[in-house]
């Protein structure tokens, strides 16, 4: 059985729902791009439609499209949302990732 590509915390799902309603978009798209000293960084964008090979993650009332090039790097990842005095951001807990010293990028094993 294949691992779930992406899991959402309740706070992440609530924030995504709020953002999608505000932007009047049906999807949030997750991709990875080459960046930082370790090679990869998470990228989130709004999407109006599903790409031909996108993986659809539907959980807790929201739909996230995972770019096909990102799937192998994010399998088993939990997406959370942190909002405190110092930051307000999505956080990715990826069991396959090794982070770099700068904290801006990761690599998968």
UniProtKB/Swiss-Prot annotation:
Subcellular location: Mitochondrion
Record's GO cellular component terms: mitochondrion
GO molecular function: iron-sulfur cluster binding; metal ion binding
GO terms of biological process kind: iron-sulfur cluster assembly
UniProt-listed Pfam families: Fe-S_biosyn
Organelle targeting sequence: 1-18
Main localization (coarse): mitochondrion
Protein purpose: Involved in the assembly of mitochondrial iron-sulfur proteins. Probably involved in the binding of an intermediate of Fe/S cluster assembly.
Subunit structure: Homodimer; may form tetramers and higher multimers.
Annotated NCBIfam families: iron-sulfur cluster assembly accessory protein
Name of the protein: Iron-sulfur assembly protein IscA-like 3, mitochondrial
């Amino acid at each position: 059985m294949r691992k779930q590509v992406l899991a959402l915390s309740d706070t992440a799902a609530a924030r995504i729902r709020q953002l999608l309603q505000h932007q009047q978009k049906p999807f949030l798209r997750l991709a990875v791009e080459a960046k930082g000293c370790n090679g990869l960084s998470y990228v989130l964008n709004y999407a109006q439609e599903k790409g031909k090979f996108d993986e659809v993650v539907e959980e807790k009332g929201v739909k996230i499209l995972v770019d096909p090039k990102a799937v192998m790097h994010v399998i088993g990842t939990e997406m959370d949302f942190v909002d405190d005095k110092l930051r307000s951001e999505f956080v990715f807990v990826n069991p396959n990732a090794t982070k770099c010293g700068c904290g801006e990028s990761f690599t998968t094993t």
